[in-house]
Amino acid sequence: MAPYPYKVQTTVPELQYENFDGAKFGYMFWPVQNGTNEVRGRVLLIHGFGEYTKIQFRLMDHLSLNGYESFTFDQRGAGVTSPGRSKGVTDEYHVFNDLEHFVEKNLSECKAKGIPLFMWGHSMGGGICLNYACQGKHKNEISGYIGSGPLIILHPHTMYNKPTQIIAPLLAKFLPRVRIDTGLDLKGITSDKAYRAFLGSDPMSVPLYGSFRQIHDFMQRGAKLYKNENNYIQKNFAKDKPVIIMHGQDDTINDPKGSEKFIQDCPSADKELKLYPGARHSIFSLETDKVFNTVFNDMKQWLDKHTTTEAKP
């Protein structure tokens, strides 16, 4: 297996476990470790399809160095939460029920510390994040939303053919737990050869299994945002909450046009879309250091701008 290319500068926290609703979730809380240990806020990270905690180490490390705590968990169907044949097995109900559990856990801790909680989601997690901003139980208690290459619509390069689109709902209904290897598009994910080598040899990442139900549900979740039927976004988006979407302009997995349309439809007075020329799909976790440094700096500036409370010791 090729090594993880990034050298973590802080101390990697231990993976922790928590039982909830029939699953044993692996999660990680990364505290601020920057000399002063003053905390400006916390970011709850929602990973993409088939990802897990280690994929977020570079982002979490940088957040820590810049005064932000972070929290992420391996979703049902991914990582240590769902090993072996349970990988890829989940559905819409569990996605949001599980998320509400961890949102409540983090909100409780952040309120006790007097710090804001932001939500960040990448790809499939970006679609979850933006839908949470519209339908989440605690959507108005989150201080802001950040989407990274969110799954709203697939890029034509990745979109499956019409016959498959037609049969997908039937497969999800009658064979929900049947899994397929969807294939990992390494060139679409990143232009960095070292990260490609790591990901392509990582047993936690390949094969990239998804169940018919999981795949159907995350596609419908994105379509809900893109179609925006009955002004779903305008009527439901968290009141007065800021949102930023950051998307690689050369992303051939999730189409940047989906992000553009969401920002157009979103009623927030504080909304922003940043497109990055030359950047592919995984701009925070797996792209080149040059791309990462640019997007992280933009994210940090956005967080700093929206952090009204003074840093807490």
From Swiss-Prot:
Further comment: Present with 2140 molecules/cell in log phase SD medium.
Lineage per the UniProt record: Eukaryota, Fungi, Dikarya, Ascomycota, Saccharomycotina
EC number of the protein: 3.1.1.23
Protein name listed in UniProt: Monoglyceride lipase
Assigned keywords, A-Z: Cytoplasm, Endoplasmic reticulum, Hydrolase, Lipid droplet, Membrane, Mitochondrion, Mitochondrion outer membrane
Catalytic activity: Hydrolyzes glycerol monoesters of long-chain fatty acids; a fatty acid ethyl ester + H2O = ethanol + a fatty acid + H(+); 1-(9Z-octadecenoyl)-glycerol + H2O = glycerol + (9Z)-octadecenoate + H(+); 2-(9Z-octadecenoyl)-glycerol + H2O = glycerol + (9Z)-octadecenoate + H(+)
Pathway this chain belongs to: Glycerolipid metabolism; triacylglycerol degradation
Record-linked InterPro entries: AB_hydrolase_fold, Hydrolase_4, MAG_DAG_Lipase
Effect of pH on activity: Active from pH 4.5 to 8.
Localization in the cell: Lipid droplet; Cytoplasm; Endoplasmic reticulum; Mitochondrion outer membrane
